[in-house]
């Protein structure tokens, strides 16, 4: 029985073309016959990866495969396909790029001709697959406040999705049993031989009767109409780390839609949506708060209560603080996603200018303005360049 092409390459069903190409090249370099002489198992894995890549790298074939499984691309993906195979029509750029990775860099450097450091680094695990077609991935958006993002949070999500039918236990059969497909005798494949002037060719395709599963439902379950799945609701707990950003996503393996007739579950993709805060702005892992003070407080200095993500804290504003000065409260910002520690809480200080001062206020200001200390020194103001002033704002 053919394995699921996404499983062969070790990628999810929502994988991008670049992710598919990267996964394929890693497998092709690992199992290439030149690196595994007289190894029949490696040869089969190499052919399998070629076949999967030929389908998933082609938009039309991938669409048909996603909709109909192996039956939708039966005649197009032979075991010899793919950019390294005899019958494939893969991207020539991939061919030369992959061969250069395999045989180029290492040989020029005098080391291993295969560059094992690159070949075997990184990578991800593959998921095992039970019988049946895989369930589809499920994508949801999760709104988070800045307070939740700052520390990380555990969320319990109620999700509507396809679940295994509880009447037939997901088999799709009224009796709970599946029978061997009479067309392919349980192999999931059909073979067609044709003779040409070059010899006999055998084309292997997914069985049209069972869709490549090797089993068929004789007596369908009436609750799920033989599909083995139905619409349901489930609860999932997800741990969101501190420091995530809008658009980041987490993939929960096997938490997506159930596969028909015992097929493996798809993945649940949780996309983060950051809710705009009422009084704070985010700048990386720092939090910015705008504080407006009176002219007197700016000149004389003062102590104020400052709101932060963890509550209010006391902060001293020094005398002669200039407009747009940024004061820093360390480690009161957002937790770093990929490192220990937290960002800072930045307080940008500005002066309050009354729009409708009283007559008495105006007279007092006129008297105050007579002082030489209250009039800006134009020469000193222009001694600092523009970029130095900007630097002062964000220092």
Swiss-Prot record:
Keyword terms of this UniProt record: Chaperone, Cytoplasm, DNA replication, Metal-binding, Repeat, Stress response, Zinc, Zinc-finger
GO cellular component, one term: cytoplasm
Annotated positions binding Zn(2+) 1: 165, 168, 221, 224
Cofactors required: Zn(2+)
Entry keyword annotation includes Repeat: yes
Role description: Participates actively in the response to hyperosmotic and heat shock by preventing the aggregation of stress-denatured proteins and by disaggregating proteins, also in an autonomous, DnaK-independent fashion. Unfolded proteins bind initially to DnaJ; upon interaction with the DnaJ-bound protein, DnaK hydrolyzes its bound ATP, resulting in the formation of a stable complex. GrpE releases ADP from DnaK; ATP binding to DnaK triggers the release of the substrate protein, thus completing the reaction cycle.
Record-given protein name: Chaperone protein DnaJ
Gene assigned in the entry: dnaJ
